[in-house]
């Protein structure tokens, strides 16, 4: 990095590690005044930490072993890329642990990595910051009523913007892993299980609507969450905007299909495929409730 005469170009390499409820991911960025932000690497490992945590508040030792192995792999990658700083964050699965400090200490002993647990608000604030950074139209968009829907494994966060200000943020306990659990229980007993899940979500959303949407006209819904953008709508994501009709058509096409068929068609792992419908159901419900005026 040192050029002639020891001049030092200010380039910094930074890694962001996210331990989510169904995957562990790391992005490595290069930051400099000249080029700004550039992504160098993006690795993901499918690991369903949320599964045990949402049912009994614990991570079993097998899962912890795998997590530490993955983090050690990430460390080697960080060395390869010459990463100077990193931030490793645990999200909802960590928030619901019975003994988070003990787990964090164990991870530190075995990997040398310090994990921060982000509160729900911090997690979503970082999400908004990233939308605001990417979308030049964000400011203009939130002048009109806009709802942001962030679908995670453990929860669904709905935020409302009106006339440029954040009106409210509500967390609803119905993320994709929880919904999938419900689906799997219902699937055995009934044919139209997607309809039942829609009902179970609709109640939560309707009460949200009664409380917050009385006089608000929602014109835009922003869907967030890596899973939606990276997996489900890869090809539509050129301009990052799809109409409600396009979403609903996609939803109707998807909802009746088996996990194996989805995995085949989308060329993704069955583990991920099993989250497709549970991720789309709350989005579809939200769109149908919030965008009634369209």
Where are these regions (language model features)?
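Helical "lid/coupling" subdomains associated with nucleotide-phosphate turnover
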Residues: 14, 52-76, 81, 93-97, ...
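Post-signal peptide N-terminal segment of secreted/secretory-pathway proteins
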Residues: 84-86
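Short, Lys/Arg-enriched N-terminal segments with co-localized hydrophobic residues
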Residues: 1-8
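Gly/Thr-rich phosphate-binding beta-strand-loop-beta motif of the actin/hexokinase/Hsp70
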Residues: 10-37, 141-169, 226
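Conserved ATP-binding subdomain of kinase catalytic cores across diverse folds
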Residues: 36-48, 53
């Amino acid at each position: 990095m040192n050029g002639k005469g020891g001049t030092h170009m200010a380039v910094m390499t930074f890694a962001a590690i996210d331990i989510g409820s169904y995957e562990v991911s790391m992005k490595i960025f290069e930051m400099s005044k000249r080029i700004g932000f550039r992504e160098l690497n993006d690795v993901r490992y499918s690991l369903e930490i949320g599964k045990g945590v949402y049912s009994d508040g614990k991570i079993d030792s097998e899962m912890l072993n795998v997590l530490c192995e993955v983090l050690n792999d990430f460390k080697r990658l960080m060395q390869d890329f010459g990463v100077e700083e990193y931030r490793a964050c645990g999200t909802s699965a960590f928030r619901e642990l019975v003994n988070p400090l003990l787990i964090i200490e164990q991870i530190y002993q075995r990997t040398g990595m310090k994990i921060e647990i982000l509160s729900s608000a911090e997690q979503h604030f970082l999400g908004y910051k990233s939308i605001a950074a990417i979308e030049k139209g964000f400011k203009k968009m939130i002048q009109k009523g806009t709802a942001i829907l962030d679908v995670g494994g453990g929860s669904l966060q709905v935020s409302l913007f009106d006339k440029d200000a954040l009106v409210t943020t509500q967390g609803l306990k119905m993320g994709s892993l929880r919904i999938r659990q419900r689906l799997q229980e219902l699937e055995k007993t009934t044919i139209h299980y997607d309809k039942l899940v829609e009902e179970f979500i609709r109640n939560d959303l309707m009460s949200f609507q009664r409380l917050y949407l009385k006089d608000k006209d929602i014109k835009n819904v922003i869907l967030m969450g890596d899973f939606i953008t990276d997996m489900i709508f890869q090809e539509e994501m050129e301009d990052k905007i799809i109409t409600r009709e396009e979403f609903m058509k996609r939803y109707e096409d998807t909802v009746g299909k088996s996990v194996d068929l989805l995995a085949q068609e989308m060329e993704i792992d069955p583990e991920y495929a099993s989250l497709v419908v549970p991720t789309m159901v709350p989005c579809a419900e939200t769109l149908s409730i919030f965008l009634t005026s369209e």
